[in-house]
């Protein structure tokens, strides 16, 4: 049996709150401790280990301590890199440190690795524009998998278009065919799907906590523990104890009653929740809404509200949006800048430190990127 964990995004402080950063560390350690308690043979981390390529010391230590506990329990760890782990300008991703110290095994280079009688292979996040360069490598690893008699696990951090058209970079037909389990990352919602042309289930455990790109909603988060004691892998869902989130709709005319009902719901919870009210109606007065929302402040970790405008078909204009906000930002930035590399530099590397007013760090990143660009031109 092994654990399949993905999109941990260690270091993310949603809404700038330390409590949200600690929430992620809490669910992450819960997943690791559960894996140890259940005596899994190994753990797969399917990318986006960290939220940014240059994570804080706290985030680095959280991962290191978890890997140490796993290793002390006789449990091996394997990982690939997601786009949040990879900087466009830094040559060595932080997770490589764990590989070099033998805390974990990096398998994102496409080279097969045999763990006891299980065949493992993985690929780091591949951009859509790079996929054509990977067809031969996919064929090579597929051939090696076909010749192996036991279980074969492919680890990737990719979106599949048949599962999510917004965040998909490749179709299921592009993937190697001869694996018995596809340990996927990148999509933050849980999916488990079988394709007739693939040798096993395609599994996305989703993120371990709700992240900024997912909005505020009541959603279960967790990971898979996969039984491979028989010919067919059996993925079992393990739910993690995340902070409660409440998303409600309310009519402006009944706002007082709606907030009272939310307060009653909050009274039943063990933790202060994150709350969003979507308010519709005629002649909405923001000052009145703000005054009513103040009733929630002391009982929530974070609360916000949005006015819902109806279009001519009487449907909400806020309900239509891409599932993966990060990828949509990169798409829009690519269009504006004329370069996907520059867009990823801006969104992945510069946006967070700029938001925290880390001007010196941003300046250094820009200088390093310029130096790399100049060397390429020579």
Region roles according to the model:
Residues 1-66, 146, 353-364, 372-378:
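N-terminal active-site segment of His-dependent metallophosphoesterases
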Residues 1-22, 210, 221-243:
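Domain-start "cap" segments at the beginnings of catalytic or binding domains
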Residues 29-39, 139-140, 255-269:
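A short, well-ordered alpha-helical element
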Residues 39, 119, 150, 178, ...:
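Short loop/turn motifs at secondary-structure junctions
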Residues 42, 53-220, 224-227:
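His/Asp/Glu-rich metal-coordinating catalytic cores
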Residues 230-378:
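Accessory, non-catalytic peripheral segments of nucleic-acid enzymes
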């Amino acid at each position: 049996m092994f654990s399949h964990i993905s999109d941990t995004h260690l270091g993310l402080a949603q809404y700038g709150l330390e409590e949200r950063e600690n929430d992620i560390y809490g669910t992450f350690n819960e997943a690791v401790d559960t894996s140890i308690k259940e005596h899994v043979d190994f753990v797969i981390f399917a990318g986006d280990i960290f939220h940014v390529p240059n994570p804080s010391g706290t985030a680095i230590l959280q991962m290191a301590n978890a890997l140490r506990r796993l290793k002390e329990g006789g449990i091996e760890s394997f990982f690939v890199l997601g786009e949040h782990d990879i900087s466009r300008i830094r040559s060595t991703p932080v997770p490589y440190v764990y590989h070099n110290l033998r805390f974990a095994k990096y398998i994102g280079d496409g080279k097969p690795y045999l763990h006891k009688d299980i065949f493992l292979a993985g690929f780091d996040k591949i951009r859509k524009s790079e996929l054509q360069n990977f067809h031969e490598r996919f064929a090579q690893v597929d051939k090696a998998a076909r010749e192996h008699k036991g279980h074969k696990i492919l680890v990737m951090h990719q979106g599949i278009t048949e599962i999510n058209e917004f965040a998909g970079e490749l179709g299921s037909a592009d993937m190697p065919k001869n694996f018995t389990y596809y340990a996927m990352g990148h999509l933050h919602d849980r999916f488990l799907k079988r394709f007739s042309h693939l040798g096993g289930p395609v599994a996305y455990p989703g993120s371990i906590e709700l992240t900024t790109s997912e909005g505020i909603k009541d959603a279960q988060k967790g990971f898979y523990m996969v039984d491979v004691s028989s010919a067919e892998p059996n993925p079992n869902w393990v739910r993690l104890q995340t902070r409660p989130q409440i998303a409600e709709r309310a009519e402006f005319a009944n706002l007082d009653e709606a907030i009272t009902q939310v307060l009653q719901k909050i009274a039943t919870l063990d933790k202060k929740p994150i709350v969003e009210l979507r308010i519709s109606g005629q002649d909405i007065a923001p000052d009145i809404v703000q005054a009513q929302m103040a009733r929630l402040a002391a009982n929530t970790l974070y609360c916000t509200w949005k006015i819902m405008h109806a279009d001519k078909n009487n449907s909400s204009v806020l309900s239509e949006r891409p599932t993966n906000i990060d990828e949509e930002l990169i798409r829009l930035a690519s269009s504006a800048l004329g370069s996907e590399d520059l867009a990823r530099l801006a969104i992945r590397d510069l946006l967070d430190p700029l938001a925290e007013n880390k001007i010196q760090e941003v300046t250094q990143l820009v200088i390093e990127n310029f130096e790399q660009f100049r060397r390429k031109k020579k």
